[in-house]
Amino acid sequence: MRVVHVIESTATGTLAVVCTIANRLAAEGHEVQVIYSARDETPQNLHALFHPDVVLLNLQMKGPSLASTLLGLRRKLIELRPDIVHLHSSFAGFLGRLSTLFCLPSTAFLYSPHCISFIRRDVGRMKRYCFAALELLACVKSCTYVGCSESECAAIQRYLGRPAVLIENAVDRTVTARRDWNSDRSHSKTMQRIVTVGGIRVQKNPRLFAEIASSFNQDGTEFVWIGDGDPDLKRMLEEAGVRVTGWLARTEVIDAVAQADIFLSTASWEGMPISVIEAMTLGTPVVASDCPGNIDTVRHGSTGAIYHSALEARMLLKRIMDDDVFRNALTRQAREEARDRFSEDRFFNNVALLYAAKLKGIRQRVPA
């Protein structure tokens, strides 16, 4: 089977998902290509993240000319003639479908938005419907939507009137192999470290992170933002006493989350956050905002804590710091659930079965 992944957002959770699928496919002997765009936050060691047999092809998708980008992507996909094209993130999903109109009839197309655009909470209803209109335009090309959470699938059905196949995200084996790290650490120390991971952008709500950080005594609590992004928002975080690390190598991110006392998500919207799943798997208790994606991942009071305001977040953080019984219960239940629900094997098996079903359906409709 020849599979091509198209990814414009080549960083963080979306990249982690593509790596997992591509590497497992390549290890099983399938032919895998990844067409990607490089961003400022794209890891410098990108090639090292993939199986040696995965072929990486650079194509900058946010160039000066949309027409030239569409034509370039069309030419590349026709040249590769894949059995499966899997599009990742909204922009790649839009380009990938429009660029292949009236070609590749024997290819099955799948599209994983990884947090579809009309889930956004920073825009009004009219703009969300504009996003939906663009999605409907791209739907001229037959393609299977793959949602990563119940919230995302529900949004696709609501705005587009189309079903989506639910395949929840997962973490790769480099994380699950180290899930006992955090349980061995002492949490009675004087300095508590609270971390988050991601780009410094509106979606991750750094203003809320700064507000929560400012409410704590900096002598006893350290807030860390692992990532980089908007300079003004970064400055605001630093003025609130937050340490911003910049982009780190994946192994360094895993180390930092594993050694943290609490993982704090302040996101305003998510698909299904890989960083939260990784924290759960590593045994770092999670305190997360009540946004789409987070509420699909964390079960309040069982596998983590969900808050509705900065004040409630502070109260939950303090309780986890002060109440070892509560903390240990959250950690234990989160790790147990993550081991099965968010396992790489479960995720890849679901993806592989979907690929096989869609390819079989295409071949039955299109004569060889």
Can you annotate each of these PLM segments?
Residues 128-145:
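Membrane-proximal helix-turn-helix segments that form the acceptor-binding/catalytic region
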Residues 15-20, 196-215, 225:
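A conserved mid-protein helix/loop that constitutes part of the nucleotide-sugar donor-binding site
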Residues 234-251:
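Nucleotide-activated donor-binding/catalytic signature segment of Leloir-type glycosyltransferases, i.e.
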Residues 285-288:
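Short hydrophobic beta-strand element within catalytic cores of glycosyltransferases
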Residues 268:
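Aromatic "clamp/platform" in nucleotide-sugar-dependent glycosyltransferases that forms part
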Residues 87-93, 113:
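Short His-centered aromatic/hydrophobic patch
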Residues 300-311, 319-325:
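Conserved acidic donor-binding segment of nucleotide-sugar-dependent glycosyltransferases
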